[in-house]
UniProtKB/Swiss-Prot annotation:
The gene is psuG2. This is Pseudouridine-5'-phosphate glycosidase 2. Mn(2+) binds at D145. Homotrimer. The lineage of its organism: Bacteria, Pseudomonadati, Pseudomonadota, Gammaproteobacteria, Enterobacterales. One of its GO terms (biological process) is nucleobase catabolic process.
Length: 312
């Protein structure tokens, strides 16, 4: 069962990723919003390169995804990663709705979970590692602020390894939304939904799977049977780097209050909240964020190796 890249004049797949795909070697997609908007410089560029190295160490090829000069890129050079990291907020945050406009204007864009999934699927990449998915924001019953990531998971056939939804979100409503749209929520060696900085939450996953092989098999069966759409693989942050629930909850509640007072909304909301939580925790949340991304990259690479070995 081979996955071929879709021919697209706006898609540029790097030579390393092209060679891997043509030779049926495992590839793991990575997003770029975390580089431009999720972490400060220079931690962002250092982390991005560490994540790529972690994937290589575990037998797969990394494909960091972004829009560069109006081209969708699957596989970035170190120079391109450093460019996104330095420019930070000057880089447009790009989800599904934004892609055609950023491409048409020849601009640069940092891809969210949703747009990274889209470009990964075009390139023939089936698995993607990130920190946390977007979801239903707190207060969404008034604002209807729901991340486009959730709709993308319902229709684009890419598995996303994450530490759950970002803990700044309403985790209960996020799980309900995923259930409504038929998106499997897999807990890796856990029955409880991880809450990004914390290993557990009051909410449950749909199913617990304890090995990369089991997850790879579930991916293959889902898509072989014609069931389109993604899967969420929720991987708890390593215990030494997990944050106390009381500390992170207090910081999140304050950050959310401030976002409401300052009328921060839309695509600016998540970067604002993450940055403010980092400030309120004295940088502890940034350290935890880096470690959970590395942990997710390692698991994604192991799943990718199993998937390619058995099903490609």
């Amino acid at each position: 069962m081979k996955n071929h890249a879709i021919s697209n004049k706006y898609l540029d797949i790097s030579p390393e990723v092209t060679e891997a795909l043509e030779n049926n070697r495992p590839v793991v997609a990575l997003e770029s919003t975390i580089i431009a908007h999720g972490m400060p410089y220079p931690q962002n560029v250092k982390t991005a390169l560490q994540v790529e190295q972690k994937i290589r160490e575990n037998g797969a090829v990394p494909a960091t995804i972004a829009v560069i000069n109006g081209m969708m890129k699957a596989g970035l050079s170190h120079e391109e990663i450093a460019f996104l990291a330095r420019k930070g907020d000057e880089i447009t945050k790009v989800s599904r709705r934004d892609l055609p406009f950023v491409i048409a204007a020849g601009k640069n864009g940092a891809t969210t979970v949703a747009s990274t999934m889209i470009i990964a699927a075009m390139a023939g990449i089936r698995i993607f590692a990130t920190g946390g998915i977007g979801g239903v924001h707190r207060g969404a019953e008034q604002t209807f602020d729901i991340s486009a990531d959730l709709q993308e998971l319902a229709k684009t056939s890419v598995a996303v390894v994450c530490a759950g939804a970002k803990s700044i979100l309403d985790l209960g409503l996020t799980t309900e939304y995923l259930e409504t749209h038929g998106v499997p929520l897999i807990g890796y060696q856990t029955h409880a939904l991880p809450a990004f900085f914390c290993r557990t939450s009051p909410f449950s996953v749909n199913i617990r799977l304890d090995s990369p092989e089991q997850i790879a098999q579930a991916m293959a069966v889902k898509w072989d049977t014609g069931l389109q759409g993604g899967l969420v693989v929720a991987n708890p942050i390593p215990e030494p780097y997990a944050m106390p629930e009381a500390e992170i909850s207090a910081a999140i509640e304050q950050a959310v209050r401030e976002s409401i007072e300052q009328r921060v909304n839309g695509k600016a909301c998540t970067p604002f909240l993450l940055a403010r939580v980092s400030e309120l925790t004295g940088g502890n949340s940034l350290s935890s964020n880096i470690q959970l991304v590395l942990n997710n990259a390692e698991l994604a690479a192991k799943i990718a190796c199993c998937y390619w070995e058995r099903h490609m």
